[in-house]
Amino acid sequence: MKAMKILVASMLAACSTWAAAQQPIVIKFSHVVANDTPKGLAAEYFKKKAEDYTKGRVKVEVYANSTLYKDKEEMEALQLGAVQMLAPSLAKFGPLGVKEFEMFDLPYIFDNYDQLHKITQGPIGQSILAKLEPKGIRGLGYWDNGFKSFSANTPIKQPSDLKGKKMRIQSSKVLEAQMRALGSLPQVLPFSEVYQALQTGVVDGTENPISNLYTQKMFEVQKHLAMTEHGYLGYAVIVNKKFWDGLPPDVREQLDKAMNESTAFANRIAKHQNDQDLEKVKKSGKTAVYNLTPAEREAFKKALLPVHKEMASRIGPDLLQQVNAELAAPSKKK
C-alpha cells in the first residue's frame, strides 16, 4: 500500500512538473504611448515575432498607454521584476544615473537619421547600452520615434517666440538647459498628463515628434506647430537582467532575432508614421504648421548649440568627442 502511495505521488509530481514545463514564459512589455505610434506598432511586431520564433514557449503581453505603469513607475517596476520589458525614451536613463544617455537629448546633435544610426547601430550605442547592466538592466536595442518640434498656442518662428513660455519636458538636465537657453520655463510632467496640462494652461507648449502630437491628440489643444526638428526622441528597449540571464540560451537567441527584426521594423516605419501624422495634423485644421526658413533654422541652432558645451562635463567630454568624430567620418559603403 505504501509503495502504491509513493508511486501515485511520484506520478502526480511528474504530471505537475510536466504541466509546469508546458507553461509559457511570460514577458510583460509595458509602454506609455498609443498602439498606433512607431513604438506601439513595434511592440506588437516584437510580440508576434517572439511568439512565432519560440513556437509559443514565450508569451508577450503588451500594455500600452500607461495601462500597467506610468512614466515615473515603470523603471522601478522593471528593476523589481514586476514587469520584464520596457522601451523608455532615452531621456529616462539620465535620472537613473547613466548620464551618457543624455547625449541623445542634445539639441541639433543629429541632422538626420543616417547620422543618428551611425551611433545607435554602432559600437558607441552598444557601449552606452552596456552601462545599464550594473543597474540590473540589459539593453536590447534602440527604436526610433522621430525628431521633435515645438508647439504652442502662439506662432513660433524664432527663438524669442518661446521666451517666458512654460514648456513641458521630460525629466532631463539637458532638456532643462535647452529650454533655459530659449528663455522658456521648463516644466517636467509625465507623458500621460501632457494633454490635460496643455488643455488647462498648466503648460503653454511642448516638444514632440509628430506621431506623439497626433496620437495623443495634443494638436487639438495647440494652435501652432513649428517644424524645428531640433532634437531626437527615441527609445531603448530594455529587459530585467536577472530575468534575461535566467532564460534558456536558445530562447535568448530567438528573442534576440525577434528584437533585431523588430528594431529594423521600428526604424523603418518611424519616419513614414511621422510624415503621415503630419498630414493628418494639417488636415485637421486645428493646428497651423510652420516650416522654418533656412535662416530661421540657423537662428534656433545658434541659440541652442551652446547647450552642448554647457552639458559636456555632465555627459562626458570623451563621449561627445567620440560621437562628433564618428559623425564627421565618411559613412562606410554597405
Q: In which residue ranges do the predicted regions lie?
A:
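Juxtamembrane cytosolic interface motif at the C-terminal end of transmembrane helices
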Residues: 18-20
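N-terminal signal peptide c-region/cleavage motif recognized by signal peptidases
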Residues: 14-16
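N-terminal secretory/targeting leader peptides
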Residues: 22-115, 123-126, 130-334
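Bacterial N-terminal signal peptides that target proteins for export
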Residues: 1-8
